[in-house]
Amino acid sequence: MAANFKEQSKKHFDLNGQSYTYYDLKAVEEQGITKVSNLPYSIRVLLESLLRQEDDFVITDDHIKALSQFGKDGNEGEVPFKPSRVILQDFTGVPAVVDLASLRKAMDDVGGDITKINPEVPVDLVIDHSVQVDSYANPEALERNMKLEFERNYERYQFLNWATKAFDNYNAVPPATGIVHQVNLEYLASVVHVRDVDGEKTAFPDTLVGTDSHTTMINGIGVLGWGVGGIEAEAGMLGQPSYFPIPEVIGVRLVNSLPQGATATDLALRVTQELRKKGVVGKFVEFFGPGVQHLPLADRATIANMAPEYGATCGFFPVDDESLKYMKLTGRSDEHIALVKEYLKQNHMFFDVEKEDPNYTDVIELDLSTVEASLSGPKRPQDLIFLSDMKSSFENSVTAPAGNQGHGLDKSEFDKKAEINFKDGSKATMKTGDIAIAAITSCTNTSNPYVMLGAGLVAKKAVEKGLKVPEYVKTSLAPGSKVVTGYLRDAGLQPYLDDLGFNLVGYGCTTCIGNSGPLLPEIEKAIADEDLLVTSVLSGNRNFEGRIHPLVKANYLASPQLVVAYALAGTVDIDLQNEPIGKGNDGEDVYLKDIWPSIKEVSDTVDSVVTPELFIEEYNNVYNNNELWNEIDVTDQPLYDFDPNSTYIQNPSFFQGLSKEPGTIVPLNGLRVMGKFGDSVTTDHISPAGAIGKDTPAGKYLQDHQVPIREFNSYGSRRGNHEVMVRGTFANIRIKNQLAPGTEGGFTTYWPTNEVMPIFDAAMKYKEDGTGLVVLAGNDYGMGSSRDWAAKGTNLLGVKTVIAQSYERIHRSNLVMMGVLPLEFKKGESADSLGLDGTEEISVNIDENVQPHDYVKVTAKKQDGDLVEFDAMVRFDSLVEMDYYRHGGILQMVLRNKLAQ
């Protein structure tokens, strides 16, 4: 039998007396399939992953050949991706860890070895999403906010802390340490792994998936990774692949360098604008060209972070000498850096600007010298505004038609004022365009010492000139790691930021994800009473309407330097390039140019205070550096003691009644239609993340468990409780089910009695009768966020199959991984064209002979006995997915496989 690609590609190299195994990309070139130098670097990383992990079942020669022929006409197919590690944040991480704990309990219930239930690849959870800015502009803000954070989240934190003791290969970075993507960049990422595989030291690229869309930040250091939904992350943890189509790769050729006055933030916002115009949704983006060498690694990370905003799967910068320089700066060892360079050179993945450019699907060019100081807003990150145009842009937006770039108000808005009477007796007046929130926030920018120290220098010059921030501006500084605090301190700049109210409020996402906390009551009242259009300026990555604060209607993304400058001005209705920010101590006007540092000032400051020693010191004890976390009372027992009275964390019912052997693929008979929907049903329609209504099934459940309405919290915060989440499935207040005409929200008709009732109530009645359910849908079913509960909830309601005209990629995959059969109408056919109104009994003639993308016969029996028959495509996209389905889902398959070992 001929050797497969894995065997052909296995090679060795020696470094410092040690031999390393690796899998050489040239193996595909030697077979005459492709020239490796023609492949984009991101595709090379994927190809290495396939070569090294080929097993002739999940990953085959065919996958390797298909990916190797990247860029060739008509080359389609899917790539199985098995990342080398997984990162989680606490919002999305809780349900993933709940599933692991539930797997353990299920293993114990059937007498299996519970130690077999552990992540198979390293998992790091960073707790960063829960801190809110309650206290600010004072020296005690950090401690006060952290205390409140622990009080609000104690049960969740107790659970996550227990998991660190219970599971191998799982670590949690405590609250008040940093933001997941910055901790990943500065500490967790190895760029190249060395692991013992079959007794050999094997080198291979660091790759990952993360349960947060901005996981792409790590692409800045040449590590391939992106955000996924929870089920896909769990699959990765348990050694299972995720699948995606062979991507197009758009090359962005960078030339020249940034001019004086322009920052990495300005460049990232410009890239977002250009790539949104280009259209890169679902594609890889890779940066190359002579301009790359003029970008420090921190600038690259800022650009890569915003890949979700420009719509790409990733924004990749291949590893080069600048990457190695950053590794040294952040305290990685010289020995490891030498290994990274040697391995990547040996395996044709080290970027050199002098080498021939790869072949990209398409190329666009960006001249860095044309970037200028900018903001984005008022409602979308891709809506770029040059600083010079900001005043006119804001004024135009006030009266522009309501939409992404307008508020639909009239000119009288500019005459509005709100008088504020502070509790200390002082007074202030807020006008249209005044700034309610100015936040230095988000890993997008706080990972970048150039813009952070730049902001500190702006603050220093402003304080020395005698400028102050108006009392109505809520100011905050929330860096993504403690290293930032260290270098601002060592540069002597933090006191100047403190003088302006930019005191440290926490280490976490804060304002960037909407955890901006309340404004002062007197300010909130004044804004609400006058219905005043106020603004925020933040160094974040998203500014959708209502995201930052419910009362703040216009939100602008900007560099930390501009956040400080606008806070001083107190309004966005100003031309900062030509109008004074304020008056100095001497009574003279002070302009932006008077407080803006030069490129040399910033660079000299960075060089003097950002050192390897600082990174080594701050990350030395990263998993145990928070006393409140260390004091959490948890047992070290390997099984989690689920509290039946908890409304946040419950043992999900996925494994109840699990048989020892998997099922077989059998016909589905007598199904009733629970939902009939049109096009573009999103995962948010299927599983909302927001507020829980008091009269909904989920609201009634919480009230039955003595939870006051004011403490309902959101569906998102209760993702660890399947009882809440299943009641919230198809419960979005805006979903329209054609089976309950005249209603909006989660209602259906229960056919045995023709009653209209909540979908959850009907589903439970069908379950009592032993009746399976079906959902009929149009195009793009499951589009939007990769929300795992959209598939989990569908499963728990008893839905056996969804028949849609087309699916969004991740939701289709999630349905299979939850044991729900995705069927697709033939092109040109739909429920309506076939005359299906939802009253029918549905049967699907499927059995073990089916193969991926086969057509099966579906029969719909009308109430009068007439039959409608049609063919539907089985949307299993691989043989592995058929196994998931036989087992009832990926978690059930993992459990049975572990039992069989």
Swiss-Prot record:
InterPro entries: AcnA_IRP_Swivel (IPR044137), Acnase/IPM_dHydase_lsu_aba_1/3 (IPR015931), Acoase/IPM_deHydtase_lsu_aba (IPR001030), Aconitase/3IPM_dehydase_swvl (IPR015928), Aconitase/IRP2 (IPR006249), Aconitase_4Fe-4S_BS (IPR018136), Aconitase_4Fe-4S_dom (IPR036008), AconitaseA/IPMdHydase_ssu_swvl (IPR000573). Pfam families: Aconitase (PF00330), Aconitase_C (PF00694). One of its GO terms (biological process) is propionate metabolic process, methylcitrate cycle. The lineage of its organism: Bacteria, Bacillati, Bacillota, Bacilli, Bacillales. It comes from the Bacteria. Involved in the catabolism of short chain fatty acids (SCFA) via the tricarboxylic acid (TCA)(acetyl degradation route) and probably the 2-methylcitrate cycle I (propionate degradation route). Catalyzes the reversible isomerization of citrate to isocitrate via cis-aconitate. Could catalyze the hydration of 2-methyl-cis-aconitate to yield (2R,3S)-2-methylisocitrate. The apo form of AcnA functions as a RNA-binding regulatory protein. Belongs to the aconitase/IPM isomerase family. This is Aconitate hydratase A. Gene3D superfamilies: 6.10.190.10, Aconitase, domain 3, Aconitase, domain 4. GO terms for molecular function: 2-methylisocitrate dehydratase activity; 4 iron, 4 sulfur cluster binding; aconitate hydratase activity; metal ion binding; mRNA 3'-UTR binding; mRNA binding. PROSITE patterns: ACONITASE_1, ACONITASE_2.
